């Protein structure tokens, strides 16, 4: 009796499924890295806007705006981000959930300089910007 075997064996199908799984995993990792980088760049852009807002605030009020009135670092949260939007960014909605970062501002011991801190919501990445607009990562391995 002559039987024609058409189709794929179970092993061939398993190999194809395994290859598709590997490709999907690589794609998901690349995509989430892309999204993370985009959010970090958005935070950097908003920090530059805050710096411009600080310049305008200084020219109008004779001092910088601080979400943390004491010297030392601040802890970014929703309240500090909303306060920055109200006082420095013209009530814009620049610091939103899609950006994935919260911001705050604090002063140094001389009260003549400011720093902007951006912290990733639910993450470890912390960006720091000084009054000259230089942005650095607090711990590069976390970003």
Give the label of every model feature segment.
Residues 34, 46-62:
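N-terminal alpha-helical signal peptides/signal-anchor transmembrane segments
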Residues 59-143:
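Periplasmic/extracellular, small/polar-rich flexible segments of pilin-like filament-forming proteins
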């Amino acid at each position: 009796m002559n039987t024609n075997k058409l189709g794929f064996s179970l092993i061939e199908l398993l190999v194809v499924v395994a290859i598709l799984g590997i490709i999907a995993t690589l794609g998901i990792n690349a995509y989430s890295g892309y999204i993370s980088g985009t959010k970090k760049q958005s935070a950097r852009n908003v920090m530059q806007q805050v710096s411009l807002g600080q310049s305008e605030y200084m020219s109008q009020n004779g001092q910088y705006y601080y979400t943390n009135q004491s010297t030392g670092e601040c802890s970014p949260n929703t309240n500090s981000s909303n306060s920055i939007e109200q006082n420095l960014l013209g009530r814009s909605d620049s610091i939103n959930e899609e950006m994935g970062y919260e911001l705050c501002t604090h002063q140094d011991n001389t009260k003549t300089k400011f720093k902007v801190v951006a912290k990733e919501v639910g993450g470890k990445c912390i960006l720091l910007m000084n009054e000259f607009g230089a942005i650095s990562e607090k711990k590069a391995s976390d970003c």
